[in-house]
Amino acid sequence: MELSSVLPCKRCTPWRGLLLTASLLTCWLLPTTAQVSIESLPPQVVEGENVLLHVDNLPENLIAFVWYKGLTNMSLGVALYSLTYNVTVTGPVHSGRETLYSNGSLWIQNVTQKDTGFYTLRTISNHGEIVSNTSLHLHVYFSTLTCGRAATSAQLSIESVPTSISKGESALLLAHNLPENLRAIFWYKGAIVFKDLEVARYVIGTNSSVPGPAHSGRETMYSNGSLLLQNVTRNDAGFYTLKTLSTDLKTEIAYVQLQVDTCFMSYAGPPTSAQLTVESAPTSVAEGASVLLLVHNLPENLRAIFWYKGVILFKDLEVARYVIGTNSSVLGPAHSGRETMYSNGSLLLQNVTRNDAGFYTLRTLSTDLKAKVVHVQLQVNTSSCCDPLTPALLTIDPVPRHAAKGESVLLQVRNLPEDLRMFIWFKSVYTSQIFKIAEYSRAINYVFRGPAHSGRETVYTNGSLLLQDATEKDTGLYTLQIIYRNFKIETAHVQVSVHTCVHPSTTGQLVIESVPPNVVEGGDVLLLVHNMPENLQSFSWYKGVAIVNRHEISRNIIASNRSTLGPAHSGRETIYSNGSLLLHNATEEDNGLYTLWTVNRHSETQGIHVHIHIYKPVAQPFIRVTESSVRVKSSVVLTCLSADTGTSIQWLFNNQNLRLTQRMSLSQTKCQLSIDPVRREDAGEYRCEVSNPVSSKTSLPVSLDVIIE
């Protein structure tokens, strides 16, 4: 009969019985030395975030391990895990937000200031001996969003923690916003969902994980969808794909890139087989700045090099190609005029916009017609930061900006008001009942489907709308209507573009293109019309979406080639015979929707809308610092303040992009930079750059002096 290592205790809860055993063992036995280590992932955690206290080198032949809050007080137990019975027993200070894993790690969700403090892991052997006591101090930072409101998102996403690791270390691919009502979760090595590339799957019904063909024995999959990779090698670098399958058989997919730092290889000798890789320099770029997609280890004997926007090798998504034989580059359909391709394969993007964010694919073709493909993700910092007195504007961003047929599109809502009664999504610029997709009531926390709901839309409580399996018919303008508690109404519009790999001119579909897509105040914008219908009797332009006389800009009669100016004509509009409209000297008042209305000879009508985005050049920001002279090991906070909204923030140190260390942290809106603790090398000049899609400005320098005691 097996002898229990837990002392009997009448009228004790399971936790107290286990606690009594552990307490007595503390008196009887001295802990032995064990190389158990605990790492906080991420190293800095802000209120409301999640943190994993990741355990390495957990001893073998254990009967149990216990986590408790503090250094010595065993009564502050969080949870105990029995390896014998594979069961978790929660302790007195368990808040309901902690999850204990069989590898010893502790997961804390939605952390608060009360979670700050020491955490201790104690391991107990099969003989009842204490094997190790290991402690870690967790510091939860106050949310520093006073300079701007963070955008919320219900989109499935993955965070690599840490963002870049060295060979032999561990990485956690942390899943955020996992959908509800899941059937299974899958991880794949690469950017393609293919059975042979499956690392592991987690089946909700059986609460178990199953390794796949691509499992190396070093991956651990958790019930929250996260994937832990231990003892990573440079072969682990690259893209990983997370796929979720819900009970209604709907799927969602998210990608993450694992970066393995192999710089030490130069000291140990070159690798036996150089791997083709692409590096984004810098890793995150502000709008208006430039970024280089730097290619490493380009193969020899090449015939051509190709760059594509996205992860799919479609001709319409080709940015540029470089032909080795002619030593020349050829521009592709997806070239925006801001890309420069070099003979070493690298691609330079200038004046980056939020539309440039996403994946890019490099394809090489050798003289023996062998191809290699590698992906890189471009991260564009579009976080807004503004003066705390400036209200945050309700905005909607389509993610991705241009979707391929069959992909999913998230209409991501930012700055949803708190005091709302309900919100409604419409598949049109008109807020009519027949165009209603769904209505969300905050009072009862319920979504009502409307007549325009196709069965592919999912509405989230943060206002965002997910459109799955997009088709050509989903292209167009969508309207979000907000109804406040005082019954005030606010609306916002967003354009959804679904690529069908066919140019609009071949479809005969009437479309309008804004040239340029983002307009600086005082500049000109052309609303360029494609595929104007034949046999027209007349066409009219309106400011807004309502076809009423007071909003009419101009009416053109085809037969008489005569134009009539309407009440909404400002004197700055020019109408061309092909239907296009040129707006001179644009102002902020010109921002918004415009409607082209056509009537043919059979009195059949057609209307189409376009949105003009007009931006003011940003004003120069300034930096506020808590102290300009600080002592070593103290802390300092720098805040970038701007009078503009809808801007991106980039921090500069000594005229170079600031490289964040583990001692530095940014607020979610990038407005505040915290350094804790301060070191001597932090002394120097700090600047912040504020940018929007049409301009950027840099603050005057602020000098930080570090006093060495």
Curated annotation (Swiss-Prot):
Glycosylation sites: 73, 86, 103, 110, 133, 207, 224, 231, 327, 344, 351, 381, 462, 561, 578, 585
Every Ig-like V-type domain range: 35-142, 155-262, 275-382, 393-500, 509-616
GO BP annotation list: immune response; T cell activation
Organism name: Rattus norvegicus (Rat)
Record's signal peptide: 1-34
Pfam families tied to this protein: ig, V-set
Function: Possibly involved in cell adhesion.
Gene Ontology CC annotations of this record: external side of plasma membrane
Sequence ranges assigned to domain Ig-like C2-type in this UniProt record: 631-695
Official protein name in the record: Cell adhesion molecule CEACAM3
